[in-house]
């Protein structure tokens, strides 16, 4: 069989999408368009509410506004191309376009992960060490955490894309997914991917597990501290400040772990698609609702923003 390297000798890949059934393309287009618009509008409202209300200019809401921005970027990398493909017969993505999509998908997704860890640290300091909160979570420290999150994520993405660009591909160029993700693309390669899989798994463990463990450790510390609070009202107040964030963490990491922390031989296309939709589309769409429905400060900020818009 002749081996061809797609980086130089082909026009690109074909994205199979969520379903090959022609009758489902328009309904899926409508569903994902609505979800994308809800994601964009909801997260923009969160950002505007935070920046328009001085009382929300705190470390927690600084990270939340950046998380909302990253969620918009994250879904924009994937959903617009998916929407075009729903109404297109070719569903082609160029080789370079595939690598670019893969790069920004990983960069924004990993930044999301680090921002969730930063928010967990913020809650840890606020609940477990409130007297030192202003010192530990000063604006300069928060900015450094944000810059560190972005830098590590983009370096990780660059390394991964450079690794993928060295692979060769054979006759098949159909990606059984709705975007260019690592596992489906690796499955197409006719190169020896064992070393690539090992590097990807090791590097993924280092980059993704680090913020995840940081988040878990923070919440274990928070739980221990809250359980020592004598009054039930005090416990409820402490837990209520973390409930929204913890819900988002479970949704995000639950699906990420299911998709990425398995050998390539165990990868299931259909299950992988469903789990990927959860953290790439559903979670970013739900985040504004999760963070605002039970948050009095956010409700006040959104109400204030609404009065400004209509006044």
UniProtKB/Swiss-Prot annotation:
GO terms for cellular component: plasma membrane. The chain crosses the membrane at residues 27-50, 59-80, 102-121, 141-159, 198-220, 238-260, 274-293. One of its GO terms (molecular function) is olfactory receptor activity. Residues 1-26, 81-101, 160-197, 261-273 are extracellular. Keywords: Cell membrane, Disulfide bond, G-protein coupled receptor, Glycoprotein, Membrane, Olfaction, Receptor, Sensory transduction, Transducer, Transmembrane, Transmembrane helix. Disulfide bonds join 98-190. Residues 51-58, 122-140, 221-237, 294-311 are cytoplasmic. Pfam families: 7tm_4. InterPro entries: GPCR_Rhodpsn (IPR000276), GPCR_Rhodpsn_7TM (IPR017452), Olfact_rcpt (IPR000725). Glycans are attached at residue 5. It is found in: Cell membrane. GO terms for biological process: signal transduction. Gene3D superfamilies: Rhodopsin 7-helix transmembrane proteins (1.20.1070.10). CDD domains: 7tmA_OR1A-like. It comes from the Eukaryota. It is a multi-pass membrane protein. Odorant receptor. Belongs to the G-protein coupled receptor 1 family. PANTHER family: OLFACTORY RECEPTOR (PTHR48001). This is Olfactory receptor 1L4. It comes from Homo sapiens (Human). The gene is OR1L4.
